[in-house]
Amino acid sequence: MNKGPTVAGQAVYSKKVLSIYDFWVLGVSNNFFWKCPTRNISEQFLMLVTSNHLDVGIGSGYYLKYYLSQSTKRIALLDLNQNSLDATSKAINHFQPEVYCGDVLEPLELNVDRFDSISVNYLLHCLPGNLID
């Protein structure tokens, strides 16, 4: 597989971009482009997240930072972008997250217990190809 497009899709998430990510994505993009307010996504996240959760394509980690129950037993992060992993793992350090750097389009050889819930918020638009592919 050509890794170039996958790497390009995540490369935009620099520390500088992550500093305005929540404002742009959650405040502007969700409301005006996708017509799906962040509060709707937050409500769905709250309904579906479990205390044994894997978040894939974590972005800024917004939903993890603000909507994880304090009783969460296990949280794991999977992303190709180290900036996102560093920022989010630091922000939710009190949960002692498992952190995995990897490409979702490549086989992942993680020798870990299963998760009860997995979220992929804002991941699909970063993957190479188009809807027909």
Language model features: what each stretch is:
Residues M1-L48, Y62:
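Conserved class I S-adenosyl-L-methionine
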Residues L127-D133:
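A short, conserved alpha-helix within the catalytic core of class I
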Residues L108-I118:
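A short acidic, Gly/Pro-enriched loop at the edge of an enzyme's catalytic core
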Residues N52-P107:
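Class I SAM-dependent methyltransferase SAM/SAH-binding core
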Residues N121-H125:
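Residues lining the SAM
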